[in-house]
């Protein structure tokens, strides 16, 4: 079951008269799985429940912003989850690609070439995700 929770907007925005403030719907699910549904399948179901199908992706580029992780660290979503998002966007007619911006600090993501190397080292490649990596340098 996918649960829904209403979350309020930033109160500063609510003070502006010319802005219509609506509550955002936030969707979440348990990380527990069963024999009939694994985590990538749950992610796909969550995206569809949240309404990704109502977005017009037909022949449009779709930047999927993701943190590729620093080389040697594990604090990033794995490529198999990115592949699920890419698959759904492509099924809806979109031209998906993964992207992230470089860092200001010195490290493995300080420029586009090193950043792409970091992404590939952490498993983000066209073969594992189904789309290209483009660094917004």
What are these regions (language model features)?
Residues 2-137:
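N-terminal and secondary-structure boundary signal
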């Amino acid at each position: 079951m996918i649960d829904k929770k209403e979350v309020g907007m930033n109160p500063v925005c609510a003070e502006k008269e010319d802005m219509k403030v609506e509550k955002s719907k936030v969707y979440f699910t348990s990380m527990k799985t069963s024999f009939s549904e694994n985590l990538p399948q749950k992610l796909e179901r969550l995206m569809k429940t949240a309404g990704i199908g109502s977005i017009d992706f037909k022949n449009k580029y779709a930047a999927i912003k993701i943190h590729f992780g620093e080389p040697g660290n594990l604090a990033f979503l794995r490529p198999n989850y990115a592949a699920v998002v890419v698959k759904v966007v492509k099924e809806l007619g979109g031209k998906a690609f993964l992207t992230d911006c470089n860092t200001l600090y010195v490290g493995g993501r300080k420029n586009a070439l090193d950043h792409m190397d970091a992404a590939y080292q952490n498993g983000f490649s066209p073969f594992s995700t189904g789309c290209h990596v483009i660094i917004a340098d």
